[in-house]
Amino acid sequence: VNCETDFVAKDENFKNFCQEVLNYCLENDSKSIEEISDDLESERQSLVQKVGENVIIRKKESIGGDNLYSYIHSNGKVGALVSLKDDNEELGKDIAMHVTASNPKFLSPEDVDSETIEKEKQILEAQVEDTNKPEEIIEKMIEGRLNKFLSEISLLKQPFVKDPSTSIENILNDHKNSIVEFTRIEVGEGIEVEQKDFASEVQAQLQNS
């Protein structure tokens, strides 16, 4: 749910509306965001009149499973949900925090779609086209950089934010567990230009705890 200012975001009327939207989504998970917006339009209009600025029900994400864990960053603007195969609350919350901080796009390199791979290959090819190196060397350079890119955007291959010496995949193996599904949502995602370094913020929180 988007509003225009932090002032309204802290308003109790806005918070209550967000909770109402959340409850409605939980009860009507199969409905699209457009259907949910239509169903709650009168409540939205009433809120707009109270707070004096526009409010939009913009996006919803949901995942399934028997073992669900969540993490919401301290600023309340970004959070994640993780579904594990087996119950492990500490592990689930740690991975949800990692997803919030590191923003993986896929679970594993094998899950990356062909369009994303092709787009990155084109970028890499443009970077090395003027290197005057032999073709086989250029191909190896592109392959190496592409594999690095795929690892960086894949949750399982990312260094664990609480212990960068190991990966999410290794932690899961240590606990004999696996990720069924995950999702991450950020306020204003796709709207705001400013980027937040949540990984650094999480590290700072850990050091102060």
Question: In which residue ranges do the predicted regions lie?
Answer:
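N-terminal assembly/interaction segments in proteins that build large macromolecular machines
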Residues: 2-209
